[in-house]
A protein has these predicted regions:
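Long, K/E/R/D-enriched contiguous segments that form extended
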Residues: 356-362, 366-426
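Replace the tail clause
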Residues: 1-363, 367, 371-374
Length: 426
């Protein structure tokens, strides 16, 4: 039985917990072998075909010859799963500053104080963790938390995990320096990162954070926005199922889930370039700057001669190496990005998951509201209002919230995350 974990996160959670109990780790794709009653007796992530066949044959033999053993093991796993979801209420007292500092000290042991983020690979952006670190700094005045937050936000936005041409963050970095991403780009990641960078701008007044938040919104609108037969106007719902928008000329009122990592049979093909391609796309002056700005290498800075466009140097270092003034640098860099984007537009695009998920759209609703507030942009509040109206009219049916909308059909009762995210977005 194949289950879409985005449609049924409740089922995914049960078998992911089982996988972590059995193996000590989790991930996707998630595969589980269960008894007829649904209790898991084996779980893991990716298996090569031959290994998967061997596992199935071995477990089938155990179930045929020693069924009691299989049922006993499944029962023990079920007991542990039940214990994971059992919460004991405790009376807690007031939270003191010393406790907050102790919690951050524990967290700090698992942080990378050179590259930002967690001290391991792969590296996920983890916006909720950075929100906590910002709150910790504001509550306690802890300067180390402030320094780490700045470090992480800058390193992430300059790394290959961030798409400097089209905006938007990829799912995670495969290395510990934010360089080589898994190129999938998802709505719920970018929504939370928009909120984070917009809030960080209001806190610090750092122009980079405003730029990143705006570029991520631009990405969501251009790449993930859906349109229907009729744009949302005057509180009326879109008619029919959403379809993908091409460009900026449509009013979006709902958003798809993700862009795939692959195109043309290669992960990242849409986003990476050979040196020869860039020499063809750009003028000599533009290429000279791009080579410094994005660390372009003759044989590629990544795999198979391709370059990931990352930005290891600070702007002042780029100015020093290029010999340009700030007045020359900014328009030239803008021209470079525009030309690369036009070239990308001629490529085969990654496939687009166009299902609209309630909780993910609600996170983007919150992101637009945060951007409207922290960046002082009324255009974002108008987009947020349109999205909220669409969600009410589409996801709220017969006094319950539904989770998935695709091809004109809204289905699957909402989960706690759908209600919680929608309430927060509103």
């Amino acid at each position: 039985i194949k289950v879409d974990r985005e449609e049924r996160p409740d089922i995914d959670m049960v078998y992911m917990d089982a996988c972590q109990l059995m193996t000590g780790r989790g991930g996707w794709p998630l595969n589980a072998i269960c008894l007829p009653n649904g209790q898991p007796i084996y779980a893991g992530t990716y298996f090569p075909k031959q290994q998967w066949q061997q596992i199935i044959e071995q477990l089938a033999k155990v179930y045929r010859e020693e069924p009691d053993k299989a049922h006993d093991y499944a029962g023990k796993i079920q007991q542990k799963l039940d214990a994971l979801n059992r919460w004991d209420s405790e009376t807690s007292g007031p939270l003191h500053r010393a406790q907050l500092l102790e919690q951050f000290t524990t967290l700090a042991e698992n942080l990378d104080w050179v590259e930002g983020g967690p001290n391991r690979a792969p590296k996920f952006p983890l916006p909720g963790q950075y929100e906590y670190i910002l709150d910790h700094h504001l509550l306690t005045g802890d300067e180390s938390a402030k320094d780490f937050l700045h470090l992480s936000l800058i390193k992430m936005s300059n790394g290959g995990i961030y798409d400097t041409i089209r905006g938007g963050f990829c799912r995670y970095s495969t290395d510990d320096q934010w360089f080589a991403p898994h190129f999938e780009k998802m709505l719920y990641d970018n929504a939370q990162l928009i909120s984070l960078y917009a809030r960080a701008f209001a806190w610090s007044d750092a122009p980079l954070y405003k730029q990143i938040a705006e570029e991520c919104i631009h990405f969501c609108e251009e790449e993930l926005g859906l349109k229907g037969d009729q744009a949302l106007k005057g509180g009326q719902a879109l008619k029919g199922g959403p379809e993908r928008s091409e460009g900026h000329n449509h009013t979006h009122a709902v958003y798809g889930s993700a862009l795939d990592a692959d195109s043309e049979g290669m992960e990242g093909k849409f986003y990476v370039f050979t040196r020869e391609e860039l020499l063809t796309i750009l003028s000599d002056e533009e290429f000279a700057l791009a080579e410094i700005q994005f660390n372009i290498q003759k044989d590629g800075n990544w795999e198979h001669g391709y370059n990931i466009l990352h930005q290891p140097l600070a702007p002042l270092q780029v100015l020093e190496k290029s010999g340009l003034t700030a007045a020359e640098y900014h328009p030239r860099l803008l021209s470079i990005k525009q030309k690369i984007k036009r070239y990308q537009d001629s490529r085969i695009r990654p496939s687009f998951d166009d299902k609209a998920i309630c909780s993910w759209n609600a996170l983007y609703l919150k992101a637009l509201a945060d951007a409207a507030l922290f960046l002082q942009n009324t255009n974002y509040s108008e987009k947020a209002t349109a999205l909220a109206d669409w969600m009410w009219l589409t996801f709220w049916q017969n006094n319950e919230l539904l989770r998935i909308h695709r091809n004109g059909i809204t289905k699957i009762s909402g989960f706690l995350e759908d209600y919680a995210c929608f309430c927060e977005g509103l």
